[in-house]
C-alpha cells in the first residue's frame, strides 16, 4: 500500500511520507536507517524543483539531525550527519535570514 501511494507523489511528498515513517520499527532511541535515509534522497531530488526547494531544505535539516541522533551509533557517522546539517543550516540561514524554523534546525544540528 505505501509503495503504491509513493509512486504517484512528487519527490517532496515521497520524502515527507518516508520522514513520517522514520520511527516505524524503532526500539527505544534507535531507529532503522532505511526510512530516513530514503527520505533524505527524495529531499535532495526535491531541491531541484523551485516549487518544493524551500520545504525540502528544511526537511533535510530535520532529517540529518534525526539520522545522526537516532540511527547512527558510530560517533563519526553521527558527527558527519550533524556537520552536514550544520553546513546546510549555515547556507540556509543566509538564504532565509528571517526564518525562525531554519535558525532553529541549524542550532539543533549544532548540538
Predicted regions, residues:
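TPR/TPR-like alpha-solenoid repeats
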Residues: 63, 70, 109-110
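Surface-exposed, active-site-proximal loop segments in enzymatic domains
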Residues: 24-27, 68-77
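Short coil turns that delineate tetratricopeptide repeat
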Residues: 51, 97-98
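Canonical positions in the second alpha-helix
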Residues: 46, 91-92
